[in-house]
Regions:
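Solvent-exposed loop/turn segments connecting transmembrane beta-strands
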Residues: 176-182
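Alpha-helical hinge/cap motifs
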Residues: 169, 173-174, 191-193
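Short secondary-structure subsegments characteristic of cysteine-rich extracellular domains
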Residues: 183-193
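Metallo-beta-lactamase
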Residues: 192-200
Length: 200
């Protein structure tokens, strides 16, 4: 156990930047418009060092894993409470859309066979100086494919006497992850309710 502790080091770093802004306004009575923009950017790095004196290890080994990515979302909605229907009827209509995009990349490097006098910091500063004759080095680099989605949605809410409720929704989602011939999915739904507690 002591040998493992003395010959094993792990360093992980993560960074994230996020921005979320929203704007809401009411141009006319009953109509509320809202737009929201969200941005997220992230980076991460992990350094793993295993010395040759650790249990089960023959060589000094350095492993470096890196990743980065982003996610953005922009949504806009219009919500209108219909005016002039009297006290018995309430009708609300909402329409909107949402656009999002994301992507992630990753890379992995493993170097084996560094000189005994090297420590973790020196090895990671000179990862290309591993012992290539061992044939144990590994390299992998993945460039992610951007993913995009576009959604349109709408909702109608109606109530009579605040007792009898009806809701209808419709959503259409398009995604770059869907098959080429079927980029869109459609999701309609209806619901009804009755507030017994409001009955006279």
């Amino acid at each position: 156990p002591v040998a493992i502790m003395d010959n094993y080091e792990n360093l992980r770093k993560r960074y994230r930047v996020g921005v979320n802004n929203a704007l809401t306004w009411t141009p006319i009575k009953g109509l509320t418009a809202k737009t929201e923009l969200y941005l997220n950017r992230n980076w991460n790095e992990t350094q793993n060092w295993t010395g040759n004196k650790a249990e089960g290890e023959k060589y000094n080994t350095a492993k470096l894993t890196k990743g980065d990515g982003y996610y953005t979302r922009w949504s806009t909605t219009l919500n209108y409470d219909v005016q002039g229907l009297g006290d018995d009827h309430k009708l609300g209509v909402l329409v909107g859309n949402e656009v999002s995009a994301s992507k992630s990349n990753s890379s992995y490097i493993k170097g084996v066979g560094y000189p005994d006098e090297w420590d973790m910091g020196y090895a990671f500063a000179n990862m290309n100086m591993s012992d290539k004759t061992l044939g144990l080095d590994e390299y992998n680099n993945t460039i992610g494919t951007p993913s995009h989605t576009l959604s349109w949605f709408g909702r109608i809410n109606y109530s009579l006497y605040d007792r009898y409720l009806f809701t209808a929704t419709m959503r259409a989602d398009g995604s770059s992850k869907f098959s080429k011939d079927n980029h869109w999915g459609y999701f309609p739904a209806v619901a009804a309710g009755w507030r017994i507690s409001e009955e006279p």
